[in-house]
């Protein structure tokens, strides 16, 4: 029996080895390369692909490599299970192993050109003999015949299969004896594992994903069973247009064989098997998926018919209707409309074109619309990366819109293939699919829902499986069942399974998961409700005619209740809602504020840049700044206005100019200024302030920005019209931060994921409150507005948030030396303010319930936010938390909410609260337990988490930042003449020890550590070496060389006499490669520099080795002249050997181009230009030590030596 995991792991390596071999073969064999290139050119011409030649070829090589490896898998399976009489490669016992080797020896002696490749092809030919096996190794289409494996490559593959372990047993033994009745043994499920994970590149390209058998069986129950009841089984036709490794096809085949045996036991078994094979069909774009499906179906047919060898199978006419091709591609005339009409008679050139690996064209009826009684499958969920295919599918399938996922065109295609009604209006084919549920709430799904599903077809069942544990399915899913009936003849209701609660823990057996079992057991019981799901026949028009679909139990009803209390929607009051702008170059244009200060950036062109994660609890957390080259009217300003910033950005000019534009060109090609943002609306007619919200978060977070920050796409803006009052802003701030708004948004928004259950990629989370959602402006602008607003509480919370920020450790440290007394006082204020905010948020939530008529009574303590009857609240003391704590105590709920938020659960209303507040809280608890609407929204999923790092963590971070800022004091890094100087760590520590404020804060930061240790630890992750060879690994040094070449060309461009000459040079400059973390010698260097290698570190380190904490440091705020001065001063004043001075001279050589660029003017200090001075001085030193420029460029640090562990004491 095969070890599935070991086989998969080993074969992954074999595929990589074969890919490498085939890549060499393509280059060595001109005919092969030319043939593939011609195929690619034709495909690109017809719009079948927009991929580059190299990426297309890489994908084809992967397909061929997998085909070679899978071919040998099929051979090995047949050898070990005696499907062929004599082995070609090996066998589990010594006899068959020796026989295989002997047979190969005989072949070598007899054949004119014997190779291992030729021997494997003989094995493939034997397996492919006969009508059923022919498709397995069809030389016209099987990818392995596209590129010949080398003799050595084939030999290594054979030798791999012959490996034995220490006991002499075959490492990969496929023996799986078939039982007498053919129902057990010959298992091929392992091939599904190979299909999904054999090639990482293929898995990503085709979104390979196995459908678990229990899901496949369920969908066949809901589709094939009714089809058999209506049409019978003998003439039934089924297809899986995305068949993958064949799970649905095999499931349908086995059902049909069983039905034939039950209903016609006297009929010849071979005829029954033939009839079942003739009924099932499958198509997949992935050649090796279809190869696996064909092999599995052939083995299943043999088992079902009692045939035990391939030779015997070749005597029967067994049709195998499985084809390779893109089942979405059809003639343009078949594109139809959202209402389902199409003309099936015409063809076009693109529909006729097929890749060499595709054979669907040899099955002309396979994809004929209206042919099938059953259409089932699990279509891919990915978006279409290839631009040509994306446009083609959009043209062929009107349901495609926006950034659609493949689930959209496949939803339409599945129904198109299903049988239409007969003359009497009956006889519709059944369609079933498990698919991504993203179309239900993301914008691209609107046309599919409101157009196609709304009119062209009849959905009969919608089953929310997002809460079920389905291994491998990391994307939330839904099962759709229906027919091709459209228009008025459809049933007014749809059987719907809605979610109540997700799977609490990963089940040992996914099929026995609590949610899945509830779905199976309740699906035929409308009106049933369990802890996990509810089942109802819901009105088609009311629940499914408009986007979004809401499949949370009671969710749609709650939305309608909220909407019914609305007097308008949010977009009525807005100038616009959407992105602030798109920088398009965040790595180059943004950095922490100190980086801009260090480079003397022109402050009027630097703005605070806010990301979504910083928008929390009515305030904006500290973060990065951004280059913002715009005036007050958002008109672009030229580099002359910001010379320091322009110099800082100069190294990235080609990268910035090479950015893609909306037209498909580049900034340079389209004549766009290289320094501008990608997109920045002028917002004429909008208020200067903005409300901003977190685009992806577990809960709704909205802030009011009065300071004119810039925001990334993760923090969209809500702009009111010019002239809007502060009150208009604040009333929306309060409303949009309410739990009611959180509920509404989560019902209509797409869930991004949370804390997953299990480790098999199943998209279920234990705690719904930890699920992140995508809150888009398109959804939010439809938010219903009540007639009144929680303006007073919104205003109070906004003011408290500003006070909270002013009491934070970072704010204290910014205003004064952060001594213990100040921090203690600030902590008291901070905790009190935060507790007050928790209390007022609770008041606001309950006020809003009454505004939307979710509860008849306004359960606030008072209309005055400052009322003393409202106590300060700590987490754990809100009404819903008391209810939750009681459920935890009763063993009915998890206590994770309290653990995660460091709060104490309480089951009784605290006696020290004011009496009016205790009474109100009791009423709130009563409402939660008796009012369904309140019970739905008063849950952790919708209540503000107030998640924070906590004071201690905030204080530690603030103290660390203060200490590091103090260590950057320019005076520390200058000598008595004001010139830059390199310091040893000991000298730096000594200087800092004389700073009483530094010493006292360091003691507060790390009370049990010596100052020297504190300074060393602080600087360890904040420095980057002065020399490339000490920063990068070899791969990074190669990229650095590319960047230096780009900079040389940019300097030539700057020196060119006129614009035509400049443009000619500019057009020849390649966009340099981006760095990755793997290019840097230490993670801290990568963290400081990023993929464009932008210097954002605090300190520069010097030395001769790659050390975590070197002995020599400088300040990163030095310009190139100051860096050169510090280096030259150091090796002038320090006695260094040739070996020791080499890296320092190399550092000076690396600075030379920058000195020539920025410091080439006369300077009295150097009696000439600094560039000339340092060049001459370096050359003098090189001469003294006999070093050439190449010696300096070739210098590398010595390899690190591992210290031997001390011997353990005896």
From Swiss-Prot:
Functional summary from the UniProt entry: BREX systems (bacteriophage exclusion) provide immunity against bacteriophage. Part of a type 2 BREX system. Probably a DNA methyltransferase, it methylates phage DNA in vitro in an S-adenosyl-L-methionine-dependent manner. Previously called the phage growth limitation (Pgl) system, it confers protection against bacteriophage phiC31. The bacteria allows one cycle of phage infection, but subsequent cycles are impaired, protecting the original bacterial colony. The system undergoes high rates (10(-3) to 10(-4)) of phase reversion, i.e. loss and regain of phiC31 resistance.
Record's catalysed reaction(s): a 2'-deoxyadenosine in DNA + S-adenosyl-L-methionine = an N(6)-methyl-2'-deoxyadenosine in DNA + S-adenosyl-L-homocysteine + H(+)
Annotated protein name in UniProt: Adenine-specific methyltransferase PglX
Record has DNA-binding as a keyword: yes
Gene Ontology molecular function terms on file: DNA binding; site-specific DNA-methyltransferase (adenine-specific) activity
Biased composition (Basic residues): 1201-1210
Comp. bias regions, Basic and acidic residues: 1181-1194
Entry keyword annotation includes S-adenosyl-L-methionine: yes
Substitution effect: residue 381 to A: Does not restore phage resistance to a deletion mutant, very little DNA methylation occurs in vitro
Enzyme Commission designation: 2.1.1.72
Family: Belongs to the methyltransferase superfamily. PglX adenine methyltransferase family.
Disrupted gene: phenotype observed: Strain is no longer resistant to plaque formation by bacteriophage phiC31 (a Pgl- phenotype).
Region (Disordered): 1181-1210
Misc note: Phase reversion of this Pgl system is due in part to the expansion and contraction of an 8-base long guanine tract in this protein (corresponding to residues 259-263). The tract has been observed to be 7, 8 and 9 nucleotides long in different derivatives; a 7-G tract yields a 282 residue and the 9-G tract a 336 residue missense protein.
Top-rank taxon: Bacteria
Gene induction: Constitutively expressed, probably part of a pglW-pglX operon.
Keywords, alphabetical: Antiviral defense, DNA-binding, Methyltransferase, S-adenosyl-L-methionine, Toxin-antitoxin system, Transferase
GO-annotated biological processes: defense response to virus; DNA modification; methylation
């Amino acid at each position: 029996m095969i070890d599935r995991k070991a086989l998969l792991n080993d074969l992954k390596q074999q595929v990589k080895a074969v890919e490498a071999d085939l890549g060499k073969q393509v280059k060595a064999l001109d005919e092969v390369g030319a043939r593939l290139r011609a195929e690619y050119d034709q495909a690109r011409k017809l719009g079948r692909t927009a991929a580059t030649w190299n990426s297309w070829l890489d994908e084809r090589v992967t397909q061929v490599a997998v085909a070679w490896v899978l071919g040998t898998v099929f051979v090995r399976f047949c050898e070990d299970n005696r499907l062929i009489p004599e082995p070609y490669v090996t066998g589990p016992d010594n006899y068959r192993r020796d026989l295989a080797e002997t047979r190969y020896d005989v072949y070598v002696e007899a054949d004119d050109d014997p190779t291992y490749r030729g021997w494997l092809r003989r094995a493939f030919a034997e397996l492919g003999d006969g009508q059923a096996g022919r498709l397995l190794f069809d030389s016209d289409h099987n990818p392995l015949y596209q590129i010949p494996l080398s003799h050595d490559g084939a030999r290594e593959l054979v030798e791999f299969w012959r490996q034995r372990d220490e006991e002499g047993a075959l490492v990969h033994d496929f023996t799986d004896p078939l039982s007498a009745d053919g129902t057990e043994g010959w298992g091929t499920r392992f091939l599904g594992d190979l299909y999904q994970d054999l090639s990482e590149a293929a898995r990503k390209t085709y979104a390979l994903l196995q459908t678990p058998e229990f899901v496949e069986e369920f969908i066949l129950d809901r589709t094939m069973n009714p089809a058999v009841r209506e049409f019978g089984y003998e003439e039934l036709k089924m297809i899986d247009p995305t068949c993958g490794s064949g799970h649905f096809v095999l499931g349908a085949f086995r059902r049909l064989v069983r039905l034939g045996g039950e209903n016609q036991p006297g009929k010849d078994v071979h005829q029954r098997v033939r009839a079942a094979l003739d009924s099932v069909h499958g198509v997949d774009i992935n050649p090796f998926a279809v190869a696996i499906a064909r092999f599995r179906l052939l083995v299943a047919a043999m088992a079902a018919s009692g045939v035990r060898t391939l030779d015997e199978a070749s005597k029967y006419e067994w049709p195998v209707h499985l084809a390779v091709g893109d089942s979405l591609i059809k003639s343009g005339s078949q594109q139809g409309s959202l209402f389902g009409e199409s003309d099936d008679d015409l063809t076009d050139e693109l529909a006729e074109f097929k890749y060499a690996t595709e054979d669907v064209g040899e099955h002309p009826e396979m994809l004929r619309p209206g042919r099938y009684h059953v259409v089932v499958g699990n279509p891919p969920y990915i978006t279409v990366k290839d631009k040509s295919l994306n446009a083609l599918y959009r043209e062929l399938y009107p349901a495609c819109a926006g950034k659609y996922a493949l689930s959209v065109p496949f939803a339409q295609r599945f129904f198109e293939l299903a049988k239409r009604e007969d003359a009497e209006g009956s006889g519709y084919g059944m369609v079933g699919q498990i698919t991504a549920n993203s179309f239900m709430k993301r914008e691209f799904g609107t046309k599919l829902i409101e157009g196609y599903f709304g009119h062209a077809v009849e959905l009969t069942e919608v089953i929310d499986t997002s809460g079920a544990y389905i291994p491998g399915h990391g994307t939330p899913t839904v099962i759709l069942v229906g027919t091709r009936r459209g228009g008025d003849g459809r049933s007014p209701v749809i059987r719907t399974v809605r979610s109540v609660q997700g799977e609490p823990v990963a089940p040992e057996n996914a099929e026995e998961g609590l949610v899945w079992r509830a779905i199976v057991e309740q699906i035929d019981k409308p009106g049933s409700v369990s802890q996990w799901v509810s089942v109802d026949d819901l009105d088609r028009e009311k629940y499914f005619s408009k986007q979004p679909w809401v499949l949370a139990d009671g969710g749609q009803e709650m939305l309608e209740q909220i909407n019914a209390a609305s007097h308008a929607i949010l977009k009525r009051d807005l100038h616009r809602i959407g992105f602030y702008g798109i920088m398009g170059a965040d790595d180059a244009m943004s950095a922490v504020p100190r980086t801009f200060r260090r480079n003397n950036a022109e402050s009027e062109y630097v703005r605070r840049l806010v990301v979504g994660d910083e928008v929390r609890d009515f305030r904006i957390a500290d973060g990065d700044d951004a280059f913002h080259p715009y005036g007050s009217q958002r008109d672009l300003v030229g580099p002359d206005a910001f010379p320091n910033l322009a110099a800082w950005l100069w190294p990235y000019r080609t990268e910035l100019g090479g950015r893609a534009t909306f037209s498909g060109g580049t900034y340079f090609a389209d004549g766009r200024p290289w320094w501008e943002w990608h997109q920045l609306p002028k917002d004429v007619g909008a208020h200067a302030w903005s409300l901003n919200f977190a685009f992806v978060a577990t809960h709704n977070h909205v802030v009011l920005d009065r300071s004119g920050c810039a925001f990334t796409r993760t923090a969209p803006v809500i702009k009111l019209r010019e002239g809007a009052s502060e009150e208009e802003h604040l009333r929306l701030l309060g409303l949009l931060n309410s739990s009611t708004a959180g509920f509404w948004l989560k019902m209509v928004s797409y869930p991004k994921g949370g804390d997953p259950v299990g480790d098999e990629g199943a998209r279920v989370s234990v705690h719904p409150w930890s699920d992140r959602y995508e809150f888009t402006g398109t959804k939010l602008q439809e938010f219903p507005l009540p007639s009144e607003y929680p303006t007073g509480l919104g205003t109070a919370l906004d003011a408290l948030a500003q006070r909270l920020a002013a009491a934070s450790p970072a704010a204290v440290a910014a205003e004064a030396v952060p001594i213990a007394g100040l921090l203690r006082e600030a902590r008291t204020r901070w905790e009190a303010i935060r507790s007050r905010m928790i209390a007022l948020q609770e008041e606001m939530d309950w006020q809003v319930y009454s505004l939307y008529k979710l509860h008849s009574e306004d359960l606030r303590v008072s209309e005055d936010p400052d009322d003393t009857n409202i106590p300060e609240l700590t987490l754990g003391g809100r009404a819903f938390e008391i209810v939750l704590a009681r459920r935890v105590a009763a063993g009915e709920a998890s206590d994770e909410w309290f653990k995660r938020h460091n709060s104490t659960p309480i089951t009784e209303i605290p006696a020290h609260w004011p009496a009016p507040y205790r009474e109100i809280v009791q009423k709130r608890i009563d409402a939660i337990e008796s009012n369904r609407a309140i019970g739905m929204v008063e849950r952790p999923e919708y209540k503000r988490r107030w998640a924070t790092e906590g004071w201690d963590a905030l204080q530690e971070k603030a103290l660390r930042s203060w200490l590091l800022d103090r260590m950057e004091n320019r005076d520390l890094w200058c000598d008595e003449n004001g010139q830059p100087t390199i310091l040893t760590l000991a000298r730096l520590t000594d200087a800092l020890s004389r700073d009483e404020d530094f010493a006292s804060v360091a003691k507060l930061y790390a009370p049990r550590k010596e100052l020297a240790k504190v300074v060393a630890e602080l600087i360890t992750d904040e420095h980057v070496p002065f020399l490339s060879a000490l920063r990068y690994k070899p791969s990074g040094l190669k990229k650095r060389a590319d960047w230096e070449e780009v900079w040389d060309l940019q300097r030539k461009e700057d020196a060119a006499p006129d614009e035509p000459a400049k443009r000619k040079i500019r057009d020849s400059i390649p966009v340099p490669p981006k760095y990755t973390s793997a290019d840097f010698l230490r993670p801290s260097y990568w963290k400081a520099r990023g993929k464009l290698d932008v210097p954002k570190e605090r300190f520069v380190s010097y030395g001769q080795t790659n050390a975590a904490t070197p002995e020599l440091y400088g300040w990163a705020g030095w310009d190139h002249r100051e860096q050169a001065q510090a280096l030259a001063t150091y090796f002038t004043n320090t006695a260094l050997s040739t070996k020791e001075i080499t890296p320092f001279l190399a550092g000076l050589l690396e600075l030379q181009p920058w000195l020539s660029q920025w410091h080439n003017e006369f300077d009295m200090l150097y009696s000439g230009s600094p560039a000339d001075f340092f060049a001459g001085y370096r050359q003098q030193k090189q001469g003294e030590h006999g070093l050439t420029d190449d010696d300096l460029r070739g210098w590398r640090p010595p390899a690190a030596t591992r210290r031997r562990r001390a011997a353990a004491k005896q």
